[in-house]
Amino acid sequence: YQRGYRWTSIQVVQLLSDLLCYASSTFNKRIQGIKEGEYYCLQPVVARKITDKEVLKKILPKDAKKDAEAWEIIDGQQRLTTLYILYKYLITKCNISAESLKEDEIELYHLTYATRKGSSVFLANIGNNDDECNDNIDFFHMSQAYETIDKWIRSIDEYELAGAKSLCQRYNLSTKVSDILNIFRSLLNAEKDKYSMYGSVQVLWYELADDK
């Protein structure tokens, strides 16, 4: 079911803008005393659980827990990949280690493109492996998405007047890059039923039966 990663900067920026607008709107409601649970729902992801032990051995990391699970993504891989790249950007810029994520029980999921050997390694090190993207079209688009996220959040180059800072000014929020990073971190880490000043991002998850 998989195809290569093909999101352009336009699609990446649209997702970032939607998330920040939602977080800003929710924050302003919170400071007005409106505290009902809210969450931003991404378009559905359709998946099938992988139960073949031999396939799992090839997919899961060697240090994976015994009860670790893996899923074949039927629909939604572009969104999941972009969210993964965004999260990798955030933890890199905020100097958050893998050990800290495990301690906080918010360890990032892993992605492997069956059509691209080495995709999981490339994604795990994205931002530090630009030389590898020139010979692989999927890696090129992934690297471009990472670069777009960086420019948009920092509001530089083509996003100087139409990046995250301009949205924050519109909603009377801090335009410091560190504060914008924290908004996205809070948004992605928040759970649906727990209070958060910026709300929560959730994914509708549809599971297909093995025989479908």
Segments predicted by a language model, with ranges:
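Glycine- and hydrophobic-rich flexible loops that cap the catalytic core of alpha/beta enzyme folds
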Residues: 1-212
